[in-house]
Amino acid sequence: MSNSEHANFPRAGFFRRLGAIIYDLLLAVAVYMIAGAIGFGIFTALSSSGLLSMNGFEHVSDLLNGTPLYKGIYQLWITLCVGLFYILFWSYGGQTLGMRAWRLKIQHPNGQSLSMITAAARLIWSLLGIGNLWILINGDKLALQDMMTRSEVVVLSKEANQMRNWHGV
């Protein structure tokens, strides 16, 4: 089944999207924790090697919490990792793992996949999921992020959900 054939599937409603959001939230927390551990490891390695001054702090965690610049860099790193989780899944297959479980796919109305830039814009416009509330008052089942990025979330058939949506896979 080509991507253009995905253009004929119905749009997803609020509760199906909410189910996928809950699944994906668990995965995003895992990505957050892994990114945090990697970032903490990098700061620990930099301070142990002497490339990063401890500025009188005894522990790296104190350094991260007590220095606004380092705390900002650390939080930016974690936020970028979680954001990339969504951007990569949305642009290279149209589905996160939570969306796959609920048979949802993000695409343009013609069935084409989102670019990484469109996926990033969609992430920003989703307002941490609050943009989905627009579906409750919009008869077209379009969320705020759908309208702003000219995309849609569709419900795939069981057969279409079994196919490999990833580019080159």
Q: What do these predicted regions represent?
A:
Residues M1-L127, L156-V169:
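Short, small/hydrophobic-residue-rich motifs at membrane-helix boundaries and re-entrant hairpins
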Residues A20, L27, W125, I135, ...:
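Hydrophobic side chains within alpha-helical segments
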Residues L104, I137-R164:
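Hydrophobic alpha-helical transmembrane segments and immediately flanking/interface helices
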Residues G129-G139:
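Glycine-rich flap/beta-hairpin and adjacent strands of clan AA aspartyl proteases
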